[in-house]
Amino acid sequence: YIIGEKMSENLLSSLNESQKIAAQHIDGPMLILAGAGSGKTKTITTRLAYLISIGIDPRSILTLTFTNKAASEMRERAFSMLDSSMINTPPLLCTFHKFGLLFLKFHMSELNRKNNFIIIDTDDKKRIIKSIDKEITTSLLVAEISRYKNSLLTPSEAKSAAQLKLYQQIAEIYEKYEEYLEKNNLVDFDDLLLLPYKILKNNQKLADEISQKYQYIMVDEYQDTNELQYRLLRLLCSSHSNLCVVGDDDQSIYGWRGATIKNILNFSEHFENTHVVKLEENYRSTDTILNHANQLIEHNRDRLGKKLIGTRQKGDSIRIYESQDENEETRKIIEDIKQLIDSGTNPKNIAILFRVNALSRSLEEGFNKAGLNYKLVGGMKFYERSEIKDLIAYFRILTNSNDNFSIKRIINKPKRGIGKTTIDKLEAKSIESGKSIFDLIQQLDSEEIGSIVGKKNSRTLKVFEASILDLKELLNESKMKFFDSFEETFDYRASYDNL
């Protein structure tokens, strides 16, 4: 390892001039306009390492990304540049939502709520909304509620702003949805940003403390930020102006989920004395591709302006093929792939990109018929799988018996004859008594439960209760013993083997 000043110099040695300027900038706002393939990640990870190498406390640095993958990659690359002794207390490098989660774990009490809240995903959100309203399309309700939150609109403000009857109904559903979340101590993904914003907005002392804690803030993919994220950043920078954002005003494609290009276009107006650095040298694409890209993007009116310069060879010409339908398109792609392979191209160097997963069907069928092996990248994420969400719901119940949301999910998984009508009756009694569904099952005897859901269901629920209580006792014992008992009790493996 190279220590101290020599290390700082060495960190910058592999950067071009524009990258060096960006990496060495310390105080004051900075906008790094980074074109595709211009070494954006290399620049900001080097800047992170550089700040630490010149003696800035790693704990005072906050770097926010949009994906866990980006955060992990940056962390690995930045830390590999430094002596391990310099990062005994590493900087916080995470997604916006992870930062919000960490913040709420410490400060949820500011909203008079407990910090053992449960995060729901999109499927959970849909189920809750569907239980509130079955007339309006669920996907519309999900999108509008998310839009309200990211626009900082409360249910009452959404009602006031609604001019059409449909949107008045949506605002009312939004209000009921928020009441449900609060009552069950649930938060959705939007809340992971909205609730920290509300807390900081209403507590200037806390906002100052957090801002003084994180003296140097960096944000990746700034063109994809929305109004809520911008407002949150303003609060995080309330005691200083050391905000460095990296983005490409030519790559803003997430307007459909609330991102606003104005955040990056107006950054210099939002933050006075902004230092703007343009990364225009492209290390990824051939000159042919860059020339076409530059000519195309010049027609974009809303941009700050930059021109990508190639560092590689000219490359092959771009070919555009317009097909009549997906089958003809697939035939043409297969024909081209076979020609490439016959001419000596390694199949591993061939990739097909498509915008939505549904477009893969025709290609997969065509490849199978043609005898071409392929690897499909993507698909359902591990934690989105139904069986994994069921298991997580079980573990939530084991640690928090007040979690009605989770118990409704797993009370009949694996199937034990408890239907929707029984669950609805239990929930109604839970609301009436002010007790959770599990506490209700636990505190009432079989006869009392039978009067609510019938004798057969009463016996089933009491067996379910006993199983949960037995597992709770094992929770603090050996992990293997607990999981063996869990699998034996609920026979989950057999249940999913039969799917």
Give a label for each model feature:
Residues 47, 73-81, 99-103, 128, ...:
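Alpha-helical scaffold elements adjacent to nucleotide-binding pockets in ATP/GTP-utilizing enzyme cores
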Residues 2-4, 9, 27-30, 35, ...:
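A basic/glycine-biased coupling hinge at the interface between accessory DNA-binding modules
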Residues 38, 219, 223-302, 306-312, ...:
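Conserved helicase motor core of SF1/SF2 NTP-dependent helicases
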Residues 32, 36-44, 108, 114, ...:
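Helicase P-loop NTPase motor core
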Residues 163, 360, 364-365, 372, ...:
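Conserved helicase C-terminal RecA-like lobe
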Residues 99-107, 250-255, 284-285, 376-399, ...:
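Short alpha-helix plus adjacent loop in nuclease-associated cores
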Residues 63, 93, 245-246, 278, ...:
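Conserved SAM-binding loop
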